[in-house]
């Protein structure tokens, strides 16, 4: 639900709250076809390590026991494919993303991996999920929640669709905490990533937004408080690679 008159940030710009989703959609329509390649180039391949750590924390069952994962903002399927590889035959993932171009990439990748029966793709909004209460055994969101206009609504929706005893996991860029690395990281982010985006995708502005959006995202302790406010218990986090990213966890008890 929009909040008339309110503003939010789109990168370093202040925009009307109701406009942010359209602006974010335009970013991902523009970069969808080269999104995963850019992730490799921007992170030096480290995003693969971070995602594997997330899947290890998820620890999906390896037997026949049914296990339903909701992967939000997971359009290209990377998290769900990794989870399916780690899980047993009872595993099923639903990828929910608001961007149709990202979902198209994910569906194509699922077909190439012969995962159509284990992973399906649904266009939807993290702030208003079209799923019944207590439908899923886990909820993951990787590098997506900072793009949601109303993060508090998305967190409440995550809580709503999880069954009691289920886990919320969020992997997101964070605040670099290692002295010296912070300056190098800022230099790389603002001087290298947008030109790299122009070279690979033809779009520097989208990557300018992405690096700015990281700086506007709450610090790990503040984001943990938001997760608790949504109803989750046993909330904790770990920072990775000197604080470049953080993995937050919470449980619906």
Swiss-Prot record:
Among PROSITE patterns, the record links this protein to: SAM_MT_UBIE, UBIE_1, UBIE_2
Biological processes, Gene Ontology terms: aerobic respiration; menaquinone biosynthetic process; methylation; ubiquinone biosynthetic process
Asked if Aminoacyl-tRNA synthetase is a keyword of the record, the answer is no
User: In which pathway is this protein known to take part?
Assistant: Quinol/quinone metabolism; menaquinone biosynthesis; menaquinol from 1,4-dihydroxy-2-naphthoate: step 2/2; Cofactor biosynthesis; ubiquinone biosynthesis
Q: Which CDD domains match?
A: AdoMet_MTases
Q: Name one Pfam family in it.
A: Ubie_methyltran
Q: Name one GO molecular function term.
A: 2-methoxy-6-polyprenyl-1,4-benzoquinol methyltransferase activity
Provide the catalytic activity annotation: a 2-demethylmenaquinol + S-adenosyl-L-methionine = a menaquinol + S-adenosyl-L-homocysteine + H(+); a 2-methoxy-6-(all-trans-polyprenyl)benzene-1,4-diol + S-adenosyl-L-methionine = a 5-methoxy-2-methyl-3-(all-trans-polyprenyl)benzene-1,4-diol + S-adenosyl-L-homocysteine + H(+)
Keyword terms of this UniProt record = Menaquinone biosynthesis, Methyltransferase, S-adenosyl-L-methionine, Transferase, Ubiquinone biosynthesis
The entry marks the following residues as binding S-adenosyl-L-methionine, namely 76, 97, 125-126
Q: Which domain of life is it from?
A: Bacteria
Q: Does the keyword S-adenosyl-L-methionine apply?
A: yes
Q: EC number(s) on record?
A: 2.1.1.163, 2.1.1.201
Protein's job: Methyltransferase required for the conversion of demethylmenaquinol (DMKH2) to menaquinol (MKH2) and the conversion of 2-polyprenyl-6-methoxy-1,4-benzoquinol (DDMQH2) to 2-polyprenyl-3-methyl-6-methoxy-1,4-benzoquinol (DMQH2).
Family the entry assigns: Belongs to the class I-like SAM-binding methyltransferase superfamily. MenG/UbiE family.
Record's protein name: Ubiquinone/menaquinone biosynthesis C-methyltransferase UbiE
Please state the gene responsible for encoding this protein.
ubiE
